């Protein structure tokens, strides 16, 4: 049992040391990002002491500037300069820096998963709406009459009294002298 614990500890130590070795190969110097400029541009500064510096974005060389400059202007932050940047000198590389600008605070990134989610939700909601309309509209509008719904009708003699003969009053004429006859 003791050997199993030592073996597990050895495997864990080797795994952690491999990650440390990978970081050492990447570079000691960092790339600094300056996005608090008045003109809204994004500026990268390389921390390498070398004079001949080349800049890379996602594996492709960018910023073909003078060989003595250690800065790279990415342009305006509104143009979304996202990617993985690093600088390379004649002898060593810097650490990689991932730049990601999200200009819109309440935006949704439309990738295929988001669009398919919207479509799936729309189909499900339309299905529930159709089922609800089917069950509500499918009910019969005619209901069975009950004994309590029946009313006893009275004859006209008991409920109404006959009208009096009209007299020749102001409202008994439609026009001028024409009197109304019954």
From Swiss-Prot:
Main localization, broad class: membrane
Motif residue range(s): Di-leucine motif: 153-154
InterPro entries xrefs: CD3_esu/gsu/dsu (IPR015484), Ig-like_dom_sf (IPR036179), Ig-like_fold (IPR013783), Ig_4 (IPR032052), Ig_sub2 (IPR003598), Phos_immunorcpt_sig_ITAM (IPR003110)
Membrane disposition: Single-pass type I membrane protein
Residues glycosylated per entry: 66
Keyword Cell membrane: yes
Signal sequence coordinates: 1-22
Keyword entries, A-Z: Adaptive immunity, Cell membrane, Disulfide bond, Glycoprotein, Immunity, Immunoglobulin domain, Membrane, Phosphoprotein, Receptor, Signal, Transmembrane, Transmembrane helix
Domain Ig-like, chain residue ranges per copy: 23-98
Residue intervals annotated with topology Cytoplasmic: 138-182
Pfam families: Ig_4, ITAM
Subunit note: The TCR-CD3 complex is composed of a CD3D/CD3E and a CD3G/CD3E heterodimers that preferentially associate with TCRalpha and TCRbeta, respectively, to form TCRalpha/CD3E/CD3G and TCRbeta/CD3G/CD3E trimers. In turn, the hexamer interacts with CD3Z homodimer to form the TCR-CD3 complex. Alternatively, TCRalpha and TCRbeta can be replaced by TCRgamma and TCRdelta.
Name of the protein this chain belongs to: T-cell surface glycoprotein CD3 gamma chain
């Amino acid at each position: 049992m003791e050997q199993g614990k030592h073996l597990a500890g050895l495997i864990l130590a080797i795994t952690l040391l491999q990650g440390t070795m990978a970081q050492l190969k990447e570079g000691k110097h960092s790339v600094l990002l300056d996005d608090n400029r008045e003109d809204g541009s994004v500026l990268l500064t390389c921390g390498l002491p070398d004079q001949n510096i080349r800049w890379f974005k996602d594996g492709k060389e960018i910023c073909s500037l003078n060989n003595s400059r250690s800065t790279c202007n990415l342009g305006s932050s509104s143009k979304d300069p996202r990617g993985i940047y690093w600088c390379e000198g004649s002898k060593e590389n810097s650490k990689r820096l991932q730049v990601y600008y999200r200009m819109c605070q309440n935006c949704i990134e439309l990738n295929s998963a988001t669009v398919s989610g919207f479509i799936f939700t729309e189909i499900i909601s339309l299905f529930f709406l159709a089922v609800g309309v089917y069950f509500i509209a499918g009910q019969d509008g005619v209901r069975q009459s009950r004994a309590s719904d029946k009313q006893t009708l009275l004859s006209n003699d008991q409920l109404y009294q006959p009208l009096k003969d009209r007299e020749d009053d102001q409202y008994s004429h439609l026009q001028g002298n024409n009197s109304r006859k019954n």
